[in-house]
Amino acid sequence: MKFEEFLIGKYVNLVLLDEEVAKNTDWYTWFNFSENTKILDVGKFPHTLKKQLDYIKNELATKKEILSFEEVDRKIQLGVVEKVTNTLVGMVSAYNINYISRTCYVSVITDLRKKNFNRLKVFKECQDMLLDHLFFTLNLRKIYTGATDKKLSDFTIKIWGFKREAIFEKHAYIDGKYEDAFVLGLFKEDWQRFKKI
């Protein structure tokens, strides 16, 4: 499939999403694989192509909105395409964008069923690209993310320099028990310093 590139990296490209991507990839099926959604709020009920198309139409910023660099009130979500195989392997998102306080939340997911790429390189590069775009192109000053897994929280702190700002005790219901949720924050100046290390 020919993807419409938005941000170009060494190992991955971040691409614009539309109905064609949903119809011509296995994206919507990711949410039916329990390992992909184990620590997410989605995936508790079967997912269909129709639900994915509705999601694109109703929840995501359009290509035109993203390319205009104007304020958007919907989620900015980009596909992660592994360059060697030209395969859609993940998604990055920026949401709850506050243009007054200059903050937002980010998330990333990769399809754990796909094994023919270096997941760590892809995971690192796509998040780096998103952070750079949000801080240096959209001029945001602080970015938040979250995790319901302490190991993932610690990994995010180590790899990107986020700081743990809050712990919501027994917040998320996962595998039959309530787990803590960790809220992490990263200031633009801390990201600039962290990248130089």
Regions found by a protein language model. Give the residues of each.
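Short alpha-helical
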Residues: 22, 151-152
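Structural motif
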Residues: 34-35, 138, 160
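Amphipathic alpha-helical recognition patches that constitute DNA-binding helices
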Residues: 105, 142, 152, 159
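Active-site-proximal loop/turn and secondary-structure-junction residues that shape catalytic pockets
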Residues: 110, 149-151
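Conserved acetyl-CoA-binding loop-helix of GNAT-fold acetyltransferases
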Residues: 117-133, 155, 159
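Conserved catalytic-core motifs of GNAT/GCN5-like acyltransferases
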Residues: 144-147, 163-179
